Structure formats: C-alpha cells, structure tokens
Amino acid sequence: MDVRITIETTFDNGEKRTHQLDGISRPYRVTCPDGIGLRLEDGKRILEQIQRVILYDQVDEIIRESRVCPDCASVRAIHDYRTRVLDTLFGRVRVKAARLRRCSCD
C-alpha cells in the first residue's frame, strides 16, 4: 500500500499552491505488529514537512503583501534575500526571506 500526502494552500488573494510531501509505503503482508499504521518516525518526518510547507507559504505571503507600500501603494523593490531561522513548537526551520527597500515616498 502506498499513501501520498498532499497539502493545498489557499492564499487570501485566491491563489492556490499544492505541495507533495513524502509518502508512506507499507507491504500488504504485515509480519509484525509495528508494521500496521503510522510509525513514530513517519509521524515526525511528516509533521516536520507540514511545518516547513506552512512556514514557507506564510513567509512568502507576508513578503508579497509587505512589498506594497501602505502609503502610496507602489511596489517596493527587493534589496536581497537572507536566511532566517524560525523557532517553532516543532523545532527550528530555516527560511529564505526577502529584505525590502524603502519606498521613495518615505
């Protein structure tokens, strides 16, 4: 048996993004009791992937919305990208986040 795990993110602007996570494979002939259901290491791996996908999409949406200047509504340029480390309940996640230039109206 093969199990596929897919996450679909729907952003506030209506855009949808689909992420394919690792799957789980189980033989149909189970030889021991721990071969039935989800194993602890499977659960940890899948939870880590879910957390990473959610964080990446959240950071992407925050940056996309922050690029629009709240005063003049022009789109601010991206200065560069930096790696950020976010500490979550389920561990640390590294994300690549844009640094934005100041708007000319400031």
What kind of feature is each model-predicted range?
Residues M1-S104:
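Short, conserved DNA-binding cores of transcription-related domains
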